[in-house]
Structures are given as structure tokens and as C-alpha cells.
A protein has these predicted regions:
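Short secondary-structure boundary/capping segments
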Residues: 6-7, 109, 126-128
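Short, charged, amphipathic alpha-helix that recurs within catalytic cores of restriction-modification
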Residues: 94, 99-118
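Active-site ExK catalytic segment of metal-dependent nucleases
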Residues: 77, 81-97, 104
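Conserved beta-strand segments of alpha/beta enzyme cores
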Residues: 52, 116, 133-135
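Short beta-strand/turn micro-motifs composed of small residues
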Residues: 121
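Domain-level recognition of nuclease-like catalytic cores that cleave nucleotide substrates
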Residues: 124-152
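Accessory nucleic acid-recognition modules appended to NTPase machines
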Residues: 1-86
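Hydrophobic, well-ordered secondary-structure elements that form the walls
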Residues: 46, 77, 89, 108, ...
Length: 152
């Protein structure tokens, strides 16, 4: 979903399994990347709470090291919609370096609307909001509190 253009675009599809165990069996237990599994679990949880879920894309223009202006497409893991509520959600297994923090927040900072922008991390942290209005919440709070999106 093109967030700025507010239309569906042709981008590579992402697939999520309703049962992570079936996902693992289908992949012959070869791919055990916790970050992919966490993203899949967030998707399942959003769907079980009644949200319509899309993958978002934000188009930005940046100047490369060579001085050329280049178009880049930044992904937003989930755009969760239910009624008049919309949330932009990034799944970030770890944000252990300043570079990783910038990477995870970049697509969210390019959005110019008032909907909540949330990063779900593996760590058990107290929900917090940064100076850009981006909320970071731990996966356990996200999964165990059905109303977390409204409360943060």
C-alpha cells in the first residue's frame, strides 16, 4: 500500500502463516530467524484483533554519496486499520545500535499524518514515546494487552 498516494501498488507480496508451527514445518525447520517469526506473530495478533492489515511503502528521494538524487521505497511492516483507527507498526527484533534505530524509524518519520507510529521490539520494556512521536513497546505488552494500541 502506497501510504502517501493512498493506493495499492504492485510490490513483492509478503506471506504470513496463521500457525507458526506450520510455517516451520513447511520450511523444513531450516529458517528459524526469530525476527521473521516475531513479525509473523504480530501479523496474526493484529488479524485476530479484527484489523485489516497491509504492508506499507513510503516513497522518498535521497541524495546518494555520489550526489545523485535517488528514489527509494521504504517499507512499513504493517498498516493496521479498523474503522477510523489506523496504526503504522514496525516489527524490530532488536534495536541495538544507533544505525538500527535510524533504519527502523526512517519510514515512520517520513509519514505526515496524525496516526500512531509504533515499533514493537523483542525486549520487555516499558512503552515509551520519543521526540518524533514514535512509540516503542515490547512484544509481551503488545501480545498480552488487547487494548495496547489504544492505551499507548
Amino acid at each position: 500500500f502506497d501510504v502517501k498516494g493512498k493506493k495499492y501498488i504492485n510490490t513483492p507480496a509478503k506471506y504470513y502463516f496463521e500457525d507458526v508451527g506450520l510455517r516451520n514445518a513447511r520450511l523444513n525447520f531450516r529458517q528459524q530467524e526469530e525476527n521473521h517469526i516475531m513479525e509473523n506473530i504480530i501479523y496474526i495478533e493484529l488479524r485476530s484483533r479484527g484489523y485489516r492489515v497491509d504492508v506499507g511503502v513510503v516513497e522518498v528521494y535521497e541524495t546518494s554519496n555520489s550526489g545523485k538524487r535517488e528514489k527509494k521505497l521504504l517499507e512499513i511492516d504493517f498498516i493496521a486499520n479498523k474503522g477510523d483507527k489506523k496504526y503504522y507498526i514496525q516489527s524490530a527484533f532488536e534495536m541495538t545500535s544507533p544505525e538500527k534505530i535510524v533504519q527502523e524509524k526512517k519510514s515512520l518519520t517520513k509519514l505526515n499524518d496524525f496516526f500512531k507510529k509504533i515499533i514493537v521490539v523483542k525486549d520487555d520494556i516499558k512503552p515509551n514515546t520519543d521526540e518524533q512521536g514514535i512509540i516503542t513497546v515490547g512484544i509481551f505488552d503488545f501480545l498480552l494487552n488487547d487494548n495496547i494500541l489504544e492505551q499507548i
